[in-house]
Structures are given as C-alpha cells and as structure tokens.
Amino acid sequence: MPKKALEKIIDQAEQRLELLKELGINSFPREKVEPIFRKKTLALKRLREEIGDCQRCGLAKTRARIVFGEGDPSAEVVFVGEAPGEKEDLSGKPFVGPAGKLLTDIIELGMRIPRSRVYICNVVKCRPPENRDPKREEISACQRFLKKQLDIVQPKVIIALGKHSAQWLLEKEEPISQLRSKWGEYNGILVMPTYHPAYLLYNRAGKRELWMDIKKVIEYLKKGEIG
C-alpha cells in the first residue's frame, strides 16, 4: 500500500475518534481504541505486501495494477464486488468508474455514510480482459486474500455486489436474482446479496430492488436485529 494511502487511512481513524468525542461518547478510552485501528491498518498493509506483484493466475499478464481495496479498516459495512474494471485497473482503486459513482451515491446519499467510513474490495484483485466474468481458477487464486481482508476488518455486515461475490461468500450456485434480498452468513458475519451497480447502469428496473436490499441493511444497523 502506498505511503500516502496509509496516511489517509490513519487520518480517517483519528477523525473518527474526534467525532466520537464531539458526540460525547467517551466510553472507549483512547489508549484502547487507537491500537485497534493501528493494528488493523498494519494488518492490511502487511497483507498487501504479501500479495506483492502477484503472479498467481493468468490475470497478471493483462492487468495494469492490482486493486487491493480501500476504506476504513474498522468499518461496520464492507462491500465486496466482483472484479476491477478499466478505470479501476488504471487507478489501482476499487469502484471509481461509472458503477463506482453509483455505489458512492448508494453509500453517501442512500445510507448517509461517508464512503471513507466503509471498506470496499473485490473477489478478484485484477481486471479480467474486456471486463469478462472472473473464472473459477482466478477466484480461487485470490480467495485467501479476500478471506484475510474480511477477517481483519470484521464488519457487522457484508454487502455482496453481484453474482460472483454472493456465490463465493454464501457458497451457493443460485443466480443473484434468487440470492438477493435474503440474509446470509459468512463466518459469523451477516451478508446481504444484491445487484452489482454495473448491472443497474443498463437495467434501471433493478434500482428499486437494490434499494430494498440496502434498506434492510440500514434497518439492521439501526436496530441491531434482522427485520
């Protein structure tokens, strides 16, 4: 992970602590909370270093950059997409193209959470040629890194964006149209499968269904129970 990106994550963690103070939440002593953020940030940094210049599958031959993931290392919500697209491949950041703009609107306008307060990653870290679906062997080559990311962040909810994300997290084979909107579980973490934002760019009818799924997550975060 680049030094500037790491510094940004640490700054976000410090801003979060200041916000808690302003809200009058002082039940988390600074000496106990800060090490948690630092520990998770360091763990993600080490994981990125472990991936290195990955050559574990054929995508290494065609990618421009590895798209590791970004966001709050202590996020309550993690979004897991399928694979980087062209703009993500060039920037090294997840969800920065048209689908990323839509995802940002879902997070910030719909859920009313700053994008910087969630964590975003993909099932595979490299762009498949011509944005094709990731192959089973490519997902297999990447899966241990996704497992470690989720184990480090330990969110309350994972929102699975698209078929490949939902099928991997839930270990199911049904299409996303059947998996979406139903709570599942991954290693004790609640999972809400829904459509990938890219799907909504050419299928506007799916926006209403996606919003129904997101509202279930919002209600759970508010009440702490599944509706």
Where are these regions (language model features)?
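Short, small/acidic-rich helices and loops at N termini and domain boundaries
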Residues: 1-11
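A polyanion-binding, active-site-adjacent surface
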Residues: 15, 19-227
